């Protein structure tokens, strides 16, 4: 018996069932890489950010996440170059799905017990996604806006249900508004730190604040 189609595992019916010492023998997830492109680009290089947002409460298989990642990456490399973007998959497949294998050969009724002891063995992993949760994000330069929308639109076809494409008002992968970001950096309220930023609050020892602004 082959793999069941993923539509059998689309809906979130049971509680989360992660890999643990009670749930052993779980096959590895198909998706192993969650960040692609120019991961080490500084925060000020890629101000534009686009999100793919789920519109349903459902389960997405690790195979679907991997297929969407490859699809978006291939299009962005072709249109923006391999150093012109940074893709981040925001879901991780931690929920284990099970299968109660049934024999379909002759004399199967003598070998198996039907629905007695039907808990099932681990078959694969899925990610549970809520309404409004971000599935995938891409940050890039402002002139690549149309390419980001097209890459996410193509990746949408790898998932069941409905997803929305949203161009963020934030700067890159940070939580600060794009129209205020550069002013906050100039005032030293934000310090660039890799692909993120450190926020410097107005509270704390005065000598630290003076040393920063001297």
Curated annotation (Swiss-Prot):
Which SUPFAM superfamilies does this entry report, sorted A to Z? Ribosomal protein L16p/L10e
Q: Where is this cross-link: Glycyl lysine isopeptide (Lys-Gly) (interchain with G-Cter in ubiquitin)?
A: 188
Q: Name one Pfam family in it.
A: Ribosomal_L16
Q: What is this protein called?
A: Large ribosomal subunit protein uL16
List GO BP terms, alphabetically: embryonic brain development; regulation of translation; translation
Which family would the database say this protein is a member of?
A: Belongs to the universal ribosomal protein uL16 family.
**Which PANTHER family did the record assign?**
60S RIBOSOMAL PROTEIN L10
Task: Pull one GO CC term from this UniProt entry.
Answer: cytosolic large ribosomal subunit
Top-rank taxon of the source lineage equals Eukaryota
Protein role: Component of the large ribosomal subunit. Plays a role in the formation of actively translating ribosomes. May play a role in the embryonic brain development.
Spell out which residues are annotated as carrying Citrulline.
Answer: 32
Sorted alphabetically, which InterPro entries does this protein's record hold? Ribosomal_uL16 (IPR047873), Ribosomal_uL16_CS_euk_arc (IPR018255), Ribosomal_uL16_dom (IPR016180), Ribosomal_uL16_euk_arch (IPR001197), Ribosomal_uL16_sf (IPR036920)
A GO molecular function annotation here is: translation regulator activity
Name the UniProt key words of this record, in alphabetical order. Citrullination, Cytoplasm, Developmental protein, Isopeptide bond, Ribonucleoprotein, Ribosomal protein, Ubl conjugation
Secretion signal, residue range per the UniProt entry: none
Q: How does this chain assemble?
A: Component of the large ribosomal subunit. Mature ribosomes consist of a small (40S) and a large (60S) subunit. The 40S subunit contains about 33 different proteins and 1 molecule of RNA (18S). The 60S subunit contains about 49 different proteins and 3 molecules of RNA (28S, 5.8S and 5S).
Q: Where is this cross-link: Glycyl lysine isopeptide (Lys-Gly) (interchain with G-Cter in SUMO2)?
A: 175
Where does the UniProt annotation locate this protein? Cytoplasm
Principal localization? cytoplasm
């Amino acid at each position: 018996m082959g793999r069941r189609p993923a539509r059998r595992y689309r809906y979130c019916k049971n509680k989360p069932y992660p890999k643990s010492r009670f749930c052993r023998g779980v096959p590895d997830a198909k998706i192993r890489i969650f960040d692609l492109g120019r991961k080490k680009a500084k925060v000020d290089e890629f101000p534009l950010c686009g999100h793919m947002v789920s519109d349903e409460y459902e389960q997405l298989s690790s195979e679907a996440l991997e297929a969407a990642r490859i699809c978006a990456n291939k299009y962005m490399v072709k249109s923006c170059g391999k150093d012109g973007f940074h893709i981040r998959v925001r879901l991780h497949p931690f929920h284990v799905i099970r299968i109660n294998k049934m024999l379909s050969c002759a004399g199967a009724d003598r070998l198996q017990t039907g629905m007695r002891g039907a808990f099932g063995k681990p078959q694969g992993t899925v990610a549970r996604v809520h309404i409004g949760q971000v599935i995938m994000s891409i940050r890039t330069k402002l002139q690549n806006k149309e390419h980001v929308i097209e890459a996410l639109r193509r990746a949408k076809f790898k998932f069941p249900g409905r997803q929305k494409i949203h161009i963020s008002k934030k700067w890159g992968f940070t939580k600060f508004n794009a129209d205020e970001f550069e002013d906050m950096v100039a005032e030293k309220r934000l310090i660039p730190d890799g692909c993120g930023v450190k926020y410097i609050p107005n509270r704390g020892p005065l000598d630290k604040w003076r040393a920063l602004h001297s």
